[in-house]
Structures are given as C-alpha cells and as structure tokens.
Amino acid sequence: MEAASARAAARDRWSDMPSSSGRTPSQLQRFIQAACSPENYEPNLAVNLEIADLINSKKGTAPREAATAIVNYINHRNPNVALLALGLLDICVKNCGYPFHLQIGTKEFLNELVRRFPERPPMRPTRVQAKILEAIEEWRGTICETSRYKEDLGFIRDMHRLLSYKGYVFPEVRREDAAVLNPSDVSWKSPESCVSILNMLRRT
C-alpha cells in the first residue's frame, strides 16, 4: 500500500509539470524529465515505477518515446543526470517486457547508448561508462538468452562483441540483479520488491 501511495503521489506531483522547451511535452516525457532532473540526489523510485506503468499502459509508441528520451539523458553532460537515467533505464528494462526490450535492442538506441565511448578504452572507465557496460553485459546474459524473442535482440550481442573487440572489459553482473529478467521471476511491483530495487539503485 505504501508503494502504491508513493506512486500515486508522484503521479499527482508531476502530471502538470511545465515544459522547458517550446513544445508541450507528453505526460511520459514529463515523468522522465522529473526522474532525470539534476536536482535529484538519488533515484526517485516512485517516479521510475510510474514511468514503467505508463509505458505498459499506453503501449503503441510509448516504448520508443521513452527509450529515446532516456538515452538522451544518459548522454547528458552532467554525470549525475546520466546515472539517474541509467537507473531509470534499468527499471524499465526489468518492468516493461518485450516492447521496451525491442527498443533497446535497436542499432540506433545502442549506438546512442555508447556515443560517448572513445574508440580506445580509457585506463579506467567513468561511472557512467561502467554502468552502461554493466547493463549491456546483463542484457546479453539474460534477455538475449532467455527471451522467447531473443532473435530480435541480436544487435545487443553485436554491440557486446564490438566493445569487447575494442578492448572494453565488462563487469561481472550480480546474480540477484539479473535474476529479475528471468521469465520465472515474480513481479517487482510489490512493496518488498520496491525496497530491493531502491537498494540496488543506491549502489549506482
């Protein structure tokens, strides 16, 4: 009940958020803007889960709209904004299923995801680069192997091979962090699951 109340409060708070551009953003874009605001010192779990719910409920072009907006924030100059966006991306991947997985598996998305990666790996990756490498490694070992639609996710495997060829080293993914992407896992939308997600995001 507490998690549901928090998400309802987030919906009320951000549903009328003004636009910072000339165009009026969609409800989904306003939520993503709120989730990735540089004023946030840590991920807002309630807003992140509300975004996942919006993607699932609206369907249609919502997965593509969300993936495009999120990857733009991942490339933000402010590393805190980029890390917030990566945390949001993780929530969406683990809660939105195939329609969203299909978007992150496109060549366009993956090229944008690694746009700030130099041709030669740095001696030590930045926190943002490390989180991106971790995400790609996690996707390769989970949805690219266990999803019934894994044949549609070949570009993720291709990107993993390309980065490995260039010399990038992928971190080991914690089993409990990746387990939620297994088909047999229960929903992560219970209060207990919300706490687990929040603890995971605080490690970013």
What are these regions (language model features)?
Residues D90-N95, E134-E138:
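Alpha-helical solenoid repeat architecture
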Residues P79, L110-R116:
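Extended, compositionally biased eukaryotic interaction scaffolds
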Residues E2-A67, V81, F117-T204:
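Extended acidic/polar regulatory tracts at the flanks of large eukaryotic scaffold/adaptor proteins
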Residues A82, L86-L89:
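Extended, hydrophobic/aromatic-rich amphipathic alpha-helical segments that build helical scaffolds
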